[in-house]
Amino acid sequence: MADHDLDVSGYQCPLPVLKAARKMRSLASGDVLRLLATDPAASIDVAHFCAEQGHELLSEEQIDGALLFTIRKGLAEP
């Protein structure tokens, strides 16, 4: 398992989730993605994306006006 970072700061909905989805497709099951976003809507969008795609949202933190999501890739995408 590996950790990966993706900075989508400055992008507005739906681009943060679209970029996260593209990155997740390149990861192995169990890998972790740290996603940094500045769009407040990402809080809702990322949680929904994880639930729909079978990924685990490990944490959501606010850091210096940004949102940092930690996501573990699920075993299989629907």
Can you annotate each of these PLM segments?
Residues 8-60:
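Amphipathic, hydrophobic secondary-structure cores in small proteins
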Residues 68-78:
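Core SAM-dependent methyltransferase catalytic element
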Residues 1-7:
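Right-handed parallel beta-helix/beta-solenoid
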Residues 64-66:
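Short acidic/glycine-enriched loop/turn segments that link adjacent beta-strands
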